[in-house]
């Protein structure tokens, strides 16, 4: 009921603002920068979707309409700040370099940790399993994630849990996801390794259970780029070893004081594939990471053969994350960017004065 009430009030507020019947003091716009608007006295844009090494020109224009921009990783911040395009000076007709001028700050993502909650009727018959969590999409490099994993463990009694979907968690989506997975598996009819498809909505507690399951030994992710990499963060927070490329958003929480706390997969930066281009979001002339097949397989093998070492490193990372990326610290950092502490104290003092006058 509270959620419905809140959604109703948000919708009403948006309508009143666009009709110019309400002038809010501040707007926080959580969306892709294409949709940033100057609708209040102070406008803050908040976006997570920067997975390449260049943003679209429209993002620079829309970003400069904001008073502040918040992003979820240093990769996103650096990419946004370093992107330039050519624009025409309306007064002189001269071609000039155009870039973001708006201040941009990093506020890392976080989710509330829930206690483990078992997933009913989900039984693993293999004792050593890897986990991957992604959509079936070009950016996630899912086909190679699965194909190369099978080739590495084709004659081993090892499992891979594939938590995925194509677009949503409907029954039709399950059939489509299952068929796509079958197409990959048909190439390896004699494999001994096992693939488990996990589809549909899972609660936060069920995700925590996955990360802590005794039979799940590592999370793998060789996507081309991540704005932050929330599943990797959640898994690392629980002490699950991570296998990934050392590029894009996940490096913020997988590195500490120059040290890597994950199994590093080598990669090359190359132009994005044609099928991944999304005009105004993923630029055709931008690039992202392409994991090296041999390095990925070696990382899988090292984790399988030396799991105790991987677990020890993951345990150290868990401690670091609980100290430096805990929920309260990330929440405080986010609030500070919306309403700075000194301004909050000033508002509190004004409210206290008002209440004292009333009393």
Question: Across the structure, where does each feature detected by a protein language model lie?
Answer:
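Extended catalytic core of nucleotide-activated donor transferases of GT-like folds
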Residues: 2-80
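Nucleotide-activated donor-binding/catalytic signature segment of Leloir-type glycosyltransferases, i.e.
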Residues: 171-210, 217-218
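A short alpha->beta transition loop at the rim of the catalytic pocket in nucleotide-sugar-dependent
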Residues: 215-217, 239
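Conserved donor-binding/catalytic core segment of Leloir-type glycosyltransferases
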Residues: 122-140, 146-150, 160-162
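Aromatic "clamp/platform" in nucleotide-sugar-dependent glycosyltransferases that forms part
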Residues: 224
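Short hydrophobic beta-strand element within catalytic cores of glycosyltransferases
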Residues: 241-244, 260-264
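Donor nucleotide-sugar binding/catalytic pocket of nucleotide-sugar-dependent glycosyltransferases
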Residues: 68-116, 266
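C-terminal amphipathic helix plus adjacent low-complexity
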Residues: 166, 268-359
